[in-house]
Amino acid sequence: MITTEGTRSLETLDIEKLLSILPHRYPFLLIDRIVEIDGEQEAIGIKNITINEPHFVGHFPAKPVMPGVLILEAMAQTAGAISLLRLGNKQTNLVYLMTVDNAKFRKPVIPGDQLKIHVRLLKKRSGMRRFSCIAEVKGVRVAEAEIAAMILEKE
């Protein structure tokens, strides 16, 4: 995990910077900010979970729970943002999720939670990236997965 010890230079991305990097928009932009970036190696993203999100209407009306697939998407967006950030001209590239491996959902994520998404680059080869991802709420692991993504030029 990222620490603030030593001489690392850590970056952050607010919502305006994220909107300039990622193509996602409401209701499918699933990260609010990135609070720490260490090069292209690691990042921590934040998603504040609110009852106003459209998926809670049907998942589940009496006991709202964030769908696991949206937690995975938040992981992918965090990884994609740091990948695109390092490419320079971000507007000409897109990141496509290719695989999800070893996904585990350990605890429900509910309105009022703050999802903290840790991503760490495992492998980088030409346009492909593989990341280890962990999602936490209040320091407790709620989900984890390994994801692979491909960076391609927009056509």
Swiss-Prot record:
Enzyme Commission number(s): 4.2.1.59
Cited InterPro entries: FabA_FabZ, FabZ, HotDog_dom_sf
Active site feature: 59
Family of this protein: Belongs to the thioester dehydratase family. FabZ subfamily.
Function: Involved in unsaturated fatty acids biosynthesis. Catalyzes the dehydration of short chain beta-hydroxyacyl-ACPs and long chain saturated and unsaturated beta-hydroxyacyl-ACPs.
GO cellular component: cytoplasm; membrane
Keywords: Cytoplasm, Lipid A biosynthesis, Lipid biosynthesis, Lipid metabolism, Lyase
Catalyzed reaction equations: a (3R)-hydroxyacyl-[ACP] = a (2E)-enoyl-[ACP] + H2O
Keyword Membrane among record annotations: no
The keyword Ribonucleoprotein belongs to this UniProt entry's keyword annotation: no
Biological process (GO), any one: lipid A biosynthetic process
Principal EC category: lyase
NCBIfam families: fabZ, PRK00006.1
Protein name: 3-hydroxyacyl-[acyl-carrier-protein] dehydratase FabZ
Recorded GO MF terms: (3R)-hydroxyacyl-[acyl-carrier-protein] dehydratase activity
